[in-house]
Amino acid sequence: MTTREYDYIICGAGSAGNVLATRLTEDPNVTVLLLEAGGPDYRFDFRTQMPAALAYPLQGRRYNWAYETDPEPHMDNRRMECGRGKGLGGSSLINGMCYIRGNALDYDNWSTHKGLENWTYLDCLPYFKKAETRDVGPNDYHGGDGPVSVTTSKPGVNPLFEAMVDAGVQAGYPRTDDLNGYQQEGFGPMDRTVTPKGRRASTARGYLDQAKGRPNLEIVTHALADRILFDGKRASGVTYLRGSERANAHARREVLVCSGAIASPQLLQRSGVGPGAWLKELDIPIVLDLPGVGQNLQDHLEMYIQYECKEPVSLYPALKWWNQPKIGLEWMLNGTGLGASNHFEAGGFIRTRDDDPWPNIQYHFLPVAINYNGSNAIEMHGFQAHVGSMRSPSRGRVKLRSRDPNAHPSILFNYMAEALDWREFRDAIRATREIMRQPALDRYRGRELNPGADCKSDKELDTFVRSRAETAFHPSCSCKMGYDDMAVVDEEGRVHGLEGLRVVDASIMPIITTGNLNAPTIMIAEKIADKIRGRQPLARVDVPYFVANGAMARNVAKAVRQPETV
């Protein structure tokens, strides 16, 4: 078996791996091998390229690892879905395309952890801007010439978007024109990773398209990383599988693990890096007993609050097969129409209590009543709010089941394990009902479909959450940055106690961010790419940003309709 040599080997061509591959190969003297277990991002496949088709990749296994959790003890012992992207682009190939960076205080909070002082919001903002091309042009908060195409919401797409935002404001919450700008808190339009031609802006399209022709980058698809190879405590390469064939690759400088919050700890554990007791159970030779690998797993849990729509303005007709050819043809020929949007064009972030320092609840508004994965569509005109808490105190874990790289690991998010989780979800349902009963929605709002108007008491709300809440597909934090006993990597993604090995993806977040994770993951990779290259970090951007400082979470005096008593 021959062993080829590269300066860097990247395991995983997802939101982070494609950034690293592109930035590292800007130096023509550096060679990079990019390994991806999935296939290409076929540009002719509408399932991944059409924004409106976002549910399709989650329904099969061509583009989705289709993980399932162990029975979740606080969720009626349900085995819950944990979809992760497979193919060039990783989860940016199958996600909802919502471009949300997180709250400024997420990063300021990270920076209070020992050793993470350079992860403040103002340190991270230059890398958000570097990655982005926003369709309305750059400003103090946004970039204009980055690899990721970001499309802003346009007025008049669907009257339900504006009505739902107006309802949030009428309920006493702020209005914000930019969820990624000065103030995340409030309701407003939502940016999306969609190209000007109406195509999904995955990192394969944005980053790899500019790098894949470089002679110093080799991309190998259908290549499943089996183990990281070590020479003592130094990572020296990777052994991987292509079908039934095994190949080895040697890394002169570093191995970069970018396989995501599920597969990165799985690969480390399979390679002998992780909790020693777990490795001994599978007779894996221990390279380093690192207890935090696979621990601290976090996610966002969400539920769908659904209503009948009294006027025929929802997307319900677009779900019918006889209307879809016309929608698809317009999208294919012109890049316009219903097919060119993910239809998450409005949303918001709120605090449910005045003492919450920054938003603890996120909303995605959708002008149809359907599950995120395309299942359980309501057979009528409807609309819904996806709502969930942002910083659950519950923690889970990813644990290896088998030395076989094709075997899925044991995953337990441990959703809703803490009392605060239940309080926040009850608050979220009641806040959503207050928003939905505002005058802006009077002409559209019919009966409440889910959870249903009769679901009112704490016990009834808890039963609904336990039986119906689903993942928002934001696993993270399972190889966290930091310097405490459970930290896995340092502030530059270098694995503690080893040489030549980094983890760079959403797994290294110490605490999950407020919102969707694609944009923060790209930022993390951009920031660490400069560290790997030995470059000076981009200068901090000195801009103001909103801090609540104990301000009222909701201005009840300005609310048009007061909450109902129950």
Curated annotation (Swiss-Prot):
GO terms for cellular component: membrane. The active site is at H474 (proton acceptor). GO terms for biological process: glycine betaine biosynthetic process from choline. Keywords: FAD, Flavoprotein, NAD, Oxidoreductase. Disulfide bonds: none annotated. It catalyses: choline + A = betaine aldehyde + AH2; betaine aldehyde + NAD(+) + H2O = glycine betaine + NADH + 2 H(+). It is an enzyme of class 1 (oxidoreductase). InterPro entries: BetA (IPR011533), FAD/NAD-bd_sf (IPR036188), GMC_OxRdtase (IPR012132), GMC_OxRdtase_N (IPR000172), GMC_OxRtase_C (IPR007867). The keyword Nucleotidyltransferase does not apply. Transmembrane segments: none annotated. GO terms for molecular function: betaine-aldehyde dehydrogenase (NAD+) activity; choline dehydrogenase activity; flavin adenine dinucleotide binding. Belongs to the GMC oxidoreductase family. This is Oxygen-dependent choline dehydrogenase. It comes from Burkholderia ambifaria (strain MC40-6).
